[in-house]
């Protein structure tokens, strides 16, 4: 017997299907479902009188043959596509994306449900991969709570707490600090990796940090990012298959941007603050976007360009970099970094895929809980100001959505050698997943899974008779407690450190995962974000020209995903 449902009725029951469109929060961005893996009339749904019951949608298969958890009828938004599917999780990893059910009685089932299977209802929800923030100043451990609740599940950077050096630079300096921070990582339900200090002109001070567990090295101008330090740091990285992140020389003391690029010698490097105001060679650090070996990112304080962006930056900069406003030279240093023209160009360079990643710069001018919000605010602003991308039509913004989600998921993972574990929703990867109601997309997740287990969720009064009564707010769940914490999150280290047995020597509880393939990555590997324009910046007007075109846009006076979501 066939029952015909309207699209509205079907979407309300099972979530949107192929050809349906979903608005992301209150933005002008619309995504359209490209494919539905489920089968009409054979959908599985949990609940009283519904499908996932013994002998119906649930089979008799034993635990070894069924997933531990399925997310039913979810919309997946990832760099590879926008699809509707059931998601299977097994042993903390994504096991399959397809059609769940009982293969004994249903056709087309690729994921068998059994008595060992838990169900998370994904109908009407969007699922994304956990975010990856690659620009963390580990100033306060409480950042992790904020980041996790925003949908970020991996944090990479450096620091030792609110030390003056950490306030300004993302470095965990030396073996002793590296060991202590790796031990501290055991206490937090998030994936972590630490960068050592890369500013030295001889190899051994850097090699010993990699051997102690650093996933890479950070060159920062506040420690002296000279051509000699750059060359030495990249040589050590090549020898150890680790990544180098760099904050270049704002004052152009040791050379101009051309000197820095020359010191790279064509070697792969992640350029932090490839942007309009965050630091680095003033005023033309944006030039490096055109280099094949440069993997550029920018940070969220300038995302997107608004009428308030310039005003808040000066005071932030003075605090973060230990500057004194009564000293003329310090004030000039700060003012040289804040340029409306290059900030405006940064918006467009993100939209065209020249800037490959977006991160926070946590508590050091950036906001750790706003990476995802500001990514999508930038996408919205560019849609409004520049219209549809050539790859998109009038019906949807699918390519733009894939481009922007890649900036904080797969591209950071590729850059830092962790894409074999995290960064996308693909079988075999660690099940770090974020579930969103479309109306709250990018702003307030409904639930965050770490390693296949619920880590954080919106939860009501624990003394209530049901889960939903007020006050509803983010609460840590069972993945953050006891021994489950260490089994649902990862600590990333160098291969050298893993081979040296630091897990046993340091007494680490979390599983350690070596980074790999950091040195073979090029801009061409940055998914949907590989454009390499020839950029020039006028030294007097700061106008940015890319491939002969002036890049400029107006500041936004109103943004979506803002005040209406944060009344309480």
Swiss-Prot record:
Cofactor stoichiometry and binding remark: Binds 2 nickel ions per subunit.
EC code: 3.5.1.5
Q: Which Gene3D superfamilies match?
A: Metal-dependent hydrolases, Urease, subunit C, domain 1
GO terms in the biological process aspect are: urea catabolic process
Query: According to the lineage, what is the superkingdom?
Result: Bacteria
Q: What GO CC annotations are associated with the protein?
A: cytoplasm
In this protein, which residues make up the domain named Urease?
130-568
The reaction(s) annotated as catalysed by this protein in its Swiss-Prot or TrEMBL entry are: urea + 2 H2O + H(+) = hydrogencarbonate + 2 NH4(+)
Q: Where is this chain's protein located in or outside the cell?
A: Cytoplasm
Supply one GO molecular-function term: nickel cation binding
Question: NCBIfam families annotated for this entry?
Answer: PRK13206.1, PRK13207.1, urease_alph
Q: Read off the HAMAP family from this record.
A: Urease_alpha (MF_01953)
Q: How is this protein named in the record?
A: Urease subunit alpha
Which species expresses this protein natively?
Answer: Burkholderia ambifaria (strain ATCC BAA-244 / DSM 16087 / CCUG 44356 / LMG 19182 / AMMD) (Burkholderia cepacia (strain AMMD))
